Amino acid sequence: MNQNKPLPPWANIIPKDAFISYSPTYKVGEYFDRFHKESFKPADFADLTYYFYDPSEHGFPKDKTYPLITFLHGASNALEGDVCINYAGGEFYAKDQYQKALGGAYLLIPLANEYRDEEGRVKGGWGETPVNVLYELIDSFIKRKMGGRISKNILIGNSSGAWMTFNMGNNYAWFFDALIPVGAGEIPDDKMLDLYDKENVSLFYAIGKHDELNDFETLVVPRLERLKAMKNCFIYTPEWVQNGDKGIASINFGFEMGQHCLVNPMHCNLMFDDGTPMEPRLPNGVTGWIASL
């Protein structure tokens, strides 16, 4: 035990000079007031709640064409209310620093209709949300909120949201410019990756080598060479997922998943608190990669 926290199962294999960090170093909720909350009625599905950020309300010109970044949360996160903005990895994209790096961007955070059944199990997640329903929401948002104008269409997903990100790309490759799945072991087959290349879809594939929910050696390693062969695929597979304090990340909500929650450092633009990049190939972080598309 350490800091009254369970010792992670991987604690005995971390470097000798490393330390375990039991929580992210950032404050949750600081930018929630920059988001609006609305609901969308699909043609043949229950209403979906979503949050959004409009850059033209925060100093950017109204007549400019902007990218849209949509964030798909992980399992059970929709049950957390406004906190899902943060858990999905979208909150800090409303920060002035991030928006400046992107030249302004609309942000969209849809919520799956999650609930707990009588046994306490989470139901209604992305696995029970048809891809056409999510497409309908995003397409409608572009038309209603962005005047039908968009420079880039980017989809980011965490955990089960990363699975849904791939699922959306597999069905609507022509609709997206970039996919950023974080913590997904279900890498599409060669035929689908060929389609991504044909449709000029850029891929940022991110997963930790000690992800507790996805066996890296079994699920990821056999697909790495194929990912490297894509036209535009950035692969980020850190040996250890770290928090802003440079400690190795541990999160335990009944089971250890700190190494699965790569979304937290991704949310921090892959920057440590002292301003140094977590990934030397990305001196300007994730926002720099997005801005370069």
Q: Where are the language model's segments positioned?
A:
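A domain-start/cap signature at the N-terminus of enzymes
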Residues: 1-67, 163, 222-223, 233
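Active-site machinery of serine-nucleophile hydrolases
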Residues: 68, 72-134
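Primarily recognizes the serine-hydrolase "nucleophile elbow" in alpha/beta-hydrolase
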Residues: 150-197
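Short, proline-enriched alpha-helix->beta-strand connector loops that line the catalytic pocket
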Residues: 103, 197-203
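Short, solvent-exposed loop/turn and secondary-structure capping segments
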Residues: 62-64, 79-85, 119-123, 167-168, ...
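C-terminal catalytic histidine-bearing segment of alpha/beta-hydrolase fold enzymes
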Residues: 204-206, 210-213, 218, 226-293
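Cell-envelope and extracellular/periplasmic
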Residues: 72-79, 139-146, 158, 165, ...
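Gly/Ser-rich "nucleophile elbow"/oxyanion-hole loop immediately N-terminal to the catalytic nucleophile
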Residues: 58-64, 118-159
